[in-house]
C-alpha cells in the first residue's frame, strides 16, 4: 500500500508540474499529462509484479481494479476496455500485454510461450496515457537479474574451508609461537582468510603451523594455503555462467552452449594451471570479464514464515517425493513414513532443534538428530521449494513430473549422499564405497547453498560413481567438489553433467527468490511514436 501511495503521489506531483507549466499551450500541457499518465501505467504494473513474481503469467486475469488488456493492433474499435484514472486528474491510462514468439495474445494457459521472448527471457508491456485528446505510449521490457540467470554461480572459486580438515586427515593443527600457540588451527585460518577473491591476493596467503600426527604421534611442521579448484579439460558448462571470482583452467574446458549464454567473471579474466599444458578455455558463450558482483543473502530463514504449520519440521527429516504427495519421517516430531500432500503454497521448511555442530566431512552422517539435515529423493508433480536451516542431502534421484520445478535452498550445504568405509585412521583418502552406493544420479532442481557448497559426501573415496546430472541451476558460496581426477580421467566420485533449465530465466520454484530478493526489473524503457 505504501509503494502504491508513493506511485500515486509521484504521479500527482508530475501532473501538477505539467498543469503549472504556464504559459504553455493547452496541447503541450495535455501532452505532458499524457506522458505522466503512461509512466503511471508502467509504475502500476511494476508495483503488482513486485508483489507477485508470477503476475505476468496471469495475463488479463489479474485482480480488479486493473488497467491490463490484451494488445490492440490499432485497427477498428479500441479493445482496451480496462483503464485507470489518475487520482486528482482527468488523465488516465491503459496497459497492454505485448505477446512474443508470433503469438497474437497472452494466454494464461500458455503464458511462457505467448509472453516470454524465447531468445531473451524478457517480456514487454505498453502503457498509453491519455489527457483530453493527447495520448502517448511507453513500452517497458522486463527481465530478471539474479543467480537463476546462470547454470553455474559461485561467489568464490576456492574450496570451502570446511573441507580443509581433509588436508589434515582430521589431525589437530596449531599456529603461533611456542609455548602458547595462540594462533588459529588450519580450518579456522582458512575460514578467516580464504573468503577473498583471487584479485584481492588470495594466491599470496599461506598457513604455517604444526600438525599432530605420525607414529608415535608428535607435533610436526605443517604448511598449506587456500585450496583452488580448477575446471578440467573435459568439463562442460552447458549454460550461462557467473562467478564473482575468476576461473582456474586446466586444458580446454568448455563454457556455454551458444553466444546467448553469457560467461561472466567479476575478475579481470581467467588463469591457467601451471601443471597443465595447452590451457585455452573454449568460450562458446559470450566471454564477459569484469562483470558486476551478484550478492547472496546470508540465510534462507525467511522461508520459515512462508511454510504452513504442517510443513514446518524440526531436526533430521527424510522426504520421499511421489507425484502430488510425499512421505515424511521425523523422529523428533514422531513422524514415521507419514504420507502428506505436497504443500498448497509449495514451501517446506526444516529448522534446527538441538544441534550444536556443522558439517563434518570426515563423518558426515553422525550429526545430532536435532540438526536440520533433510534427506530427499523422488519425483515431484507440482512446484516445490525445500529450505533447510542446515543441510539438504540428496539420497536418490530427484526428477520432475511434467512442467514442474524444484528448489533446494540450504543455509549450509546441499550434498549428494555417498557413504563409504574408511580403511586407515591416518589416511582419510584410504576408503572404499559402501555396498549399494548411488551411481549415475540425476537431479532436476535449482540448487542454492547460501553459506557453503554443493558437494558430494566423501567425494575422494572409492571407485568412480558414473555421472552426476543436474538439470537446473547451481548456486554456491564456495566451489564444491564432486569428484577427483587424474588428467582427463575421474578416479573418485562423479563426472559432471550440468545443464541449464532455460525455464529459470523467467520462472522460479515457489518463493525460491524470496531469500535473495531477486525480482523482475525494467531493462528497457522507450516511448513508442506514434502512440497506440
Predicted regions and their residues:
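Aliphatic-rich helix starts adjacent to a transmembrane/signal segment
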Residues: 2-37
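OB-fold and OB-like beta-barrel modules that bind single-stranded nucleic acids
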Residues: 34, 38, 127-129, 241, ...
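N-terminal segment of the canonical double-stranded RNA-binding domain
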Residues: 1-7, 513, 521
Amino acid at each position: 500500500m505504501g509503494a502504491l501511495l508513493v506511485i500515486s503521489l509521484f504521479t500527482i506531483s508530475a501532473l501538477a508540474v505539467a498543469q503549472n507549466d504556464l504559459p504553455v499551450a493547452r496541447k503541450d500541457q495535455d501532452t505532458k499529462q499524457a506522458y505522466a499518465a503512461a509512466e503511471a501505467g508502467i509504475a502500476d504494473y511494476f508495483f503488482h509484479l513486485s508483489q507477485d513474481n508470477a503476475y505476468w503469467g496471469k495475463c488479463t486475469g489479474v485482480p480488479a481494479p486493473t488497467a491490463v488488456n490484451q494488445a490492440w493492433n490499432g485497427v477498428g474499435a479500441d479493445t482496451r476496455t480496462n483503464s485507470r484514472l489518475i487520482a486528482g486528474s482527468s488523465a488516465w491510462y491503459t496497459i497492454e500485454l505485448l505477446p512474443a514468439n508470433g503469438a497474437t495474445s497472452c494466454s494464461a494457459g500458455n503464458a511462457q510461450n505467448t509472453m516470454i521472448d524465447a531468445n531473451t527471457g524478457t517480456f514487454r508491456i505498453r502503457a498509453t496515457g491519455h489527457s483530453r485528446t493527447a495520448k502517448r505510449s511507453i513500452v517497458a521490457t522486463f527481465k530478471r537479474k539474479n543467480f537463476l540467470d546462470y547454470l553455474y554461480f559461485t561467489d568464490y572459486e576456492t574450496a570451502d574451508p570446511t573441507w580443509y580438515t581433509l588436508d589434515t586427515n582430521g589431525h589437530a593443527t596449531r599456529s603461533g609461537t611456542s609455548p602458547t600457540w595462540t594462533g588459529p588451527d588450519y580450518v579456522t585460518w582458512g575460514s578467516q582468510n580464504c573468503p577473498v577473491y583471487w584479485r584481492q591476493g588470495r594466491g599470496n596467503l599461506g598457513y604455517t603451523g604444526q600438525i599432530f600426527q605420525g607414529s608415535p604421534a608428535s607435533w610436526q611442521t605443517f604448511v598449506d594455503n587456500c585450496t583452488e579448484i580448477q575446471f578440467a579439460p573435459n568439463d562442460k558448462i552447458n549454460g550461462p555462467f557467473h562467478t564473482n571470482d575468476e576461473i582456474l583452467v586446466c586444458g580446454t574446458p568448455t563454457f556455454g552452449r551458444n553466444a546467448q549464454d553469457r560467461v561472466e567473471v567479476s575478475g579481470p579474466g581467467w588463469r591457467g594451471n601451471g601443471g597443465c599444458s595447452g590451457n585455452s578455455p573454449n568460450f562458446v558463450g559470450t566471454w564477459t570479464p569484469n562483470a558486476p558482483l551478484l550478492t547472496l543473502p546470508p540465510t534462507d530463514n525467511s522461508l520459515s514464515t512462508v511454510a504452513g504449520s504442517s510443513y514446518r519440521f524440526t531436526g533430521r527429516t527424510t522426504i520421499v517425493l511421489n507425484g502430488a504427495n510425499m512421505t515424511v519421517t521425523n523422529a523428533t516430531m514422531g513422524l514415521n513414513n507419514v504420507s502428506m500432500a505436497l504443500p498448497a503454497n509449495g514451501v517446506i521448511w526444516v529448522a534446527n532443534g538441538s544441534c550444536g555442530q556443522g558439517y563434518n566431512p570426515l563423518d558426515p552422517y553422525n550429526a545430532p538428530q536435532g540438526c536440520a539435515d533433510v534427506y530427499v529423493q523422488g519425483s515431484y508433480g507440482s512446484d516445490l521449494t525445500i529450505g533447510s536451516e542446515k543441510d539438504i542431502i540428496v539420497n536418490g534421484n530427484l526428477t520432475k513430473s511434467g512442467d514442474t520445478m524444484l528448489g533446494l535452498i540450504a543455509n549450509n550445504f546441499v550434498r549428494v549422499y555417498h557413504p563409504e568405509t574408511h580403511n586407515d585412521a591416518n589416511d582419510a583418502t584410504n576408503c572404499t564405497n559402501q555396498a549399494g552406493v548411488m551411481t549415475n544420479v540425476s537431479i532436476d532442481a535449482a540448487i542454492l547453498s547460501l553459506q557453503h557448497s554443493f558437494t558430494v559426501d566423501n567425494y575422494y573415496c572409492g571407485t568412480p560413481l558414473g555421472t552426476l546430472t543436474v538439470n537446473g541451476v547451481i548456486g554456491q558460496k564456495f566451489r564444491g567438489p564432486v569428484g577427483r581426477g587424474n588428467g582427463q580421467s575421474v578416479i573418485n566420485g562423479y563426472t559432471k553433467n550440468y545443464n541449464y533449465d532455460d525455464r529459470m530465466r523467467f520462472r522460479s520454484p515457489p518463493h525460491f527468490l524470496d531469500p535473495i530478493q531477486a525480482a523482475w526489473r525494467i531493462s528497457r524503457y522507450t516511448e513508442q511514436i506514434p502512440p497506440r
